[in-house]
Amino acid sequence: MSYSTSEMMTVAAARRLRNGAVCFVGIGLPSKAANLARLTSSPDVVLIYESGPIGAKPSVLPLSIGDGELAETADTVVPTGEIFRYWLQGGRIDVGFLGAAQVDRFGNINTTVVGDYHAPKTRLPGAGGAPEIAGSAKQVLIILKQSPRAFVDKLDFITSVGHGEGGDSRQRLGLPGEGPVGIITDLCIMEPEAGSHEFVVTSIHPGVTREQIIAATGWAIRFADDVRQTTAPSEVELAALRDLEARTAAAHGQTAGEA
């Protein structure tokens, strides 16, 4: 069965969520991957959204954290303050699942501005709860499409800290948890190198070359000694993803695949 690079990215990201994990989910690509995991490999994953739903099981992907679908399908809904103070800062979030406009080699995220902060070329959507998720979740996964504009050598602004300047930078900042443990793109999967915490390519998606990855990265990307090939999406995974996208498109008046 044929599939797109975006579908490969979403499936690869979904596989990273273990069954039973408590996951703080960002809107957009993270939500799509997390809900695909819930519908396939990890039916007991607990999805938490910033607006207060715990155990959300949306039949269509939410447009925002305030989408009623999240509250209506959740096991319970609590105040936002409880989500951050009790669940996140209390060490009860296993995985924070985040998107990004830009990321650097140490998994730091920019969702604020491109260019000078006071006179930016582009004003991005902003932080939301991402800085707190990146700082306090036990682990963080990042999903975004790969290009030199998105994978940059130096961020104009660090919205959410990953591994800081590398090495023991995160520990020196006093941030709990492991920080980012994976960056999943439409070309490959990257993981932090032991010691330096610089992200290196550990798995390449089928049909993708090293040259493509190098060309799509704004720094001198390195490859692990043992680089795997990502397992292609199964028919079950693709069917679940496409059904989810079709339901979402019908509900929101979109074209399937835009969801």
Language-model regions: role of each:
Residues 61-229, 233:
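Conserved phosphate- and dinucleotide-binding cores of soluble alpha/beta proteins
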Residues 5, 9, 13, 21, ...:
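General structural feature for long, well-ordered alpha-helical segments within catalytic domains
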Residues 225-259:
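A conserved C-terminal secondary-structure "cap"
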Residues 44-53, 71-75, 106, 121-125, ...:
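Short, Lys/Arg-enriched charge-dense amphipathic segments
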Residues 17, 21, 37, 41, ...:
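Structural signal for hydrophobic packing residues in well-ordered secondary-structure cores
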Residues 4-5, 79, 118, 255-259:
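Alpha-helix capping and helix-coil boundary motifs
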Residues 1-74:
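N-terminal active-site beta-alpha-beta segment that forms phosphate/nucleotide-binding
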